[in-house]
Regions:
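A conserved acidic, glycine/proline-rich C-terminal tail/linker
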Residues: 237-267
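HotDog/MaoC-like acyl-thioester-processing domains
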Residues: 1-26, 33-37, 98, 104-190, ...
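Hot-dog-fold acyl-thioester-processing enzymes
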Residues: 1-102, 168-170, 174-242
Length: 298
């Protein structure tokens, strides 16, 4: 097992040179088809919150400026370890082909931003998918010896498929729900520069988020919003979240910048569940589908 321990969270820019190299399609398709994830865990023994960065994060995502860590913030911090793992371990896929398809975070209690934490990130759950291979990054955050937060980010590595007569399964299309009187409903105007602004706060400088020209180089007609910014924006809009909960989201169609979108949240008091989504303002198409449920026991 390849474990690496850091005394402090590594800065994202330290991996950029290797990330650029990883964009090159080294290896053949057969190697990716027979991929094996490294058995690796990267951890930070002393994780202290940068309060200036946290204030910027709260502001751009719409979280209340209080003394607690927003539920998506550790997912952002974990990306530095994830990038290090992909460039330093024998990672079987090119980073260029990765698509962030799902994200789950669980907060076991409200977490003070003045505490000192330990964070550990591992590869997990490589499996087949209709369009290639999926795998997870699993992140756990401890305060002293108590597990206070954990998250799973699921990525898809698209692979070329052999020709077959069998029809592939159809992708489920999420339609915009009908509004009820007790639903939360907002229109958001998302500016063209949100990707650049969020990149400087999160450290995620993926070129598809920064500018139309760089996005076009990767097949997108315009720059697209970060999925984790969109998720955080939803949770910030919901406001008073439970002390302990799980929030699962699936990323659907990209949000091209600039855009107008609709945010809709439906509340089910019987199950203590919230179902929410972000939708194109002019069509029924979904950009993100999510739900908030009670956190299961650790």
């Amino acid at each position: 097992m390849s474990d690496q321990n850091f005394s402090r969270l590594p800065k994202p820019h330290t991996t950029y040179a290797n990330i650029i190299k990883s964009f090159l399609p080294i290896g053949d398709q057969e190697k990716s088809a027979n991929a094996v994830l490294p058995n690796a865990t990267y951890s930070v023994n002393t994780l202290e919150i940068d309060h200036d960065n946290l204030a910027d994060y709260r502001r751009i995502c719409g979280f209340e400026n209080n003394s607690y860590v927003p539920p998506t913030y550790f997912a952002v911090l974990s990306q530095s370890l994830q990038m290090n793992m992909m460039v330093k371990e024998p990672f079987p896929f090119t980073m260029l082909g990765l698509i962030h398809v799902q994200n789950s975070v669980t907060q076991y209690r409200r977490i003070k931003d003045s505490a000192i934490f330990k964070m550990a990130v591992s590869f997990a759950n490589l499996r087949d998918h209709d369009r290639g291979k999926q795998f997870d990054f699993v992140t756990k955050v401890f305060e002293k010896d108590e597990l206070v937060w954990e998250g799973t980010s699921t990525y898809l590595s698209r692979q070329k498929r052999q020709k077959t007569t069998q029809k592939s399964s159809t992708t489920q299309v999420e339609a915009k729900p009908t509004l009820d009187s007790n639903d939360m409903h907002e229109f958001w105007e998302i500016p063209e520069d949100i990707g650049r602004r969020y990149a400087f706060i999160s450290g995620d400088f993926n070129l598809i988020h920064l500018h139309p020209l760089s996005a076009k180089a990767f097949g997108f007609p315009k720059a697209i919003a970060h999925g984790m910014w969109t998720k955080a924006k939803c949770l910030g809009a919901l406001g008073d979240l439970p002390e302990s909960f799980t929030c699962d989201v699936t990323f659907k169609l990209p949000i091209f910048l600039p855009s107008e979108v609709e945010f809709i949240a439906k509340f089910d008091n019987r199950d203590e569940q919230v179902d929410f989504g972000v939708y194109d303002a002019t069509t029924p198409k979904a950009n993100l589908i999510g739900k908030i449920t009670q956190a299961q026991a650790k």
